[in-house]
């Protein structure tokens, strides 16, 4: 027996021939996305993050009625924003006139309450301790803006109690020389009227 070697030539189709014969070639899962696809994804993610931050800021500063956030540009630090006004609740105590001077020095005024809704809101933030507000008895109880007290009553037990104060339970008359906390009120922007 002789050893004989048989050679055979195999002709395998090329990739383009196989694609033509069997339809479109499917990309394998290991193929890389193109550079432009990566850039588009990165820009989309960046846009989503920026929109989320903007939405968060809007909700924090505008969406709620009151806020103590430092990022709200319309009120100074340590002032609380509610509606269209900023409120400052003091931590120290002064007499009524010194409290008024403190507020005026900050382009604000002692609190003038415009309605029961505002009064109810502010009482949530107050304790048993009384705070000076912009209310005085000069031939009748009047706010610092000149308007009369007409939506609430004020408790008084002496004719020397001519300045108004507020705590979580309501309005109270007090002697103007008593040192109390105070509440200032101002518009968020300096170019608006104080009252």
UniProtKB/Swiss-Prot annotation:
Protein function: Plays an inhibitory role on natural killer (NK) cells and T-cell functions upon binding to their non-MHC ligands. May mediate missing self recognition by binding to a highly conserved site on classical cadherins, enabling it to monitor expression of E-cadherin/CDH1, N-cadherin/CDH2 and R-cadherin/CDH4 on target cells.
SMART domains in the record: CLECT
Organism encoding this protein: Homo sapiens (Human)
Disulfide bonds: 75-86, 103-184, 163-176
Quaternary state and interactors: Forms a monomer and homodimer; disulfide-linked. Interacts (via ITIM motif) with PTPN11 and INPP5D.
Domain of life: Eukaryota
Gene3D superfamilies registered for this protein in UniProt: Mannose-Binding Protein A, subunit A (3.10.100.10)
Protein known as: Killer cell lectin-like receptor subfamily G member 1
Keyword Transmembrane helix: yes
């Amino acid at each position: 027996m002789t050893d004989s070697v048989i050679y055979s030539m195999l002709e395998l189709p090329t990739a383009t021939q196989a694609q033509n014969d069997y339809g479109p070639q499917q990309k394998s899962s290991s193929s890389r996305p193109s550079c432009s696809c990566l850039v588009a994804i990165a820009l989309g993610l960046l846009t989503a993050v920026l929109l989320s931050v903007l939405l968060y800021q809007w909700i924090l500063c505008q969406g709620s009625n009151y806020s103590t956030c430092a990022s709200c540009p319309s009120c100074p630090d340590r002032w609380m924003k509610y509606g269209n006004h900023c409120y400052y609740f003091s931590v120290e105590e002064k007499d009524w006139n010194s409290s008024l001077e403190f507020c005026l020095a900050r382009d604000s005024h002692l609190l003038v309450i415009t309605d029961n809704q505002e009064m109810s809101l502010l009482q949530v933030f107050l304790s048993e301790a009384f705070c000076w507000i912009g209310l005085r008895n000069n031939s009748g109880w009047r706010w610092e803006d000149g308007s009369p007290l007409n939506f609430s009553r004020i408790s008084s037990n002496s004719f020397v109690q001519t300045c108004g104060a507020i705590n979580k339970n309501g309005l109270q008359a007090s002697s103007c020389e008593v040192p109390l906390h105070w509440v200032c009120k101002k518009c968020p922007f300096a170019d608006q009227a104080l009252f």
